[in-house]
């Protein structure tokens, strides 16, 4: 039996690839991400999450004990500590795209360009990790992205102008700046991400069933 890919991925919803990744052409800094339809985490990340039930504590007059009134339940945010390396030209271009991707998906459309999208919030992405019964098509938003450009590592220069000789699916051709199109990326970087689930209210109301969830039947629909 063939084993499916269990690596962690953050991807656009299938209908919104170009809205989030930009055009599939070398003039786009996110072009390397088209080869993986989003961000593929190359190394096993550390993932932390959980589930919470909120209760409102209530007390009674002249009583020795209190009472907790149930309020709501929710999945805790998903935090990811992930490593990336740049040991080749392709890896360096991919890492550059990853950094810019997370900068982009934490921003909204603003101003007059384009006017018809003004006010559109950051996108909902799809998170997959560890197969069918862990994180399977979980809809998430990116609430925080952090990384450190450390002083004690090497930085790799890459040419971003007409860089198509290494891999047709990775190479980019960006406008040359004052450095002639060269930029530097760290040979090793650790990133920190905070995700939160973002379900569609009407779909949640019509689809969620605790009995089915308990049996694991809703895990393939993104519920955790």
Please place each PLM-identified region on the residue numbering:
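Compositionally biased, intrinsically disordered low-complexity segments enriched in polar/Pro/Gly
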Residues: 1-224
């Amino acid at each position: 039996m063939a084993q499916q890919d269990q690596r962690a991925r953050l991807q656009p919803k299938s209908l919104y690839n170009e809205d989030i990744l930009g055009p599939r052409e070398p003039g786009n800094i996110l072009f390397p991400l088209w080869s993986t339809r989003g961000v593929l985490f190359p190394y096993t990340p550390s993932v932390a999450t959980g589930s919470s039930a909120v209760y409102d504590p209530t007390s009674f007059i002249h009583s020795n004990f209190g009472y907790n009134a149930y309020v709501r339940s929710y999945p805790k945010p998903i935090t990811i500590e992930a490593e990336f390396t740049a040991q080749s030209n392709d890896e360096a271009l991919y890492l550059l795209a990853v950094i810019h991707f997370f900068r982009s998906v934490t921003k909204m459309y603003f101003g007059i360009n384009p006017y018809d999208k003004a006010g559109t919030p950051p996108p909902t992405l799809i998170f997959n990790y560890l197969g069918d019964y862990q994180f399977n098509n979980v809809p998430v938003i990116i609430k925080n992205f952090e990384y450190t450009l450390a002083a004690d590592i090497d930085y790799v220069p890459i040419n971003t102008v007409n860089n198509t000789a290494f891999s047709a699916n990775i190479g980019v051709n960006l406008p040359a700046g004052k450095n002639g199109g060269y930029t530097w990326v760290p040979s090793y970087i650790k990133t920190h991400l905070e995700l939160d689930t973002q379900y569609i209210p009407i779909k949640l109301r019509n689809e969620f069933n605790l009995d089915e969830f308990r049996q694991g039947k809703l895990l393939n629909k993104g519920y955790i």
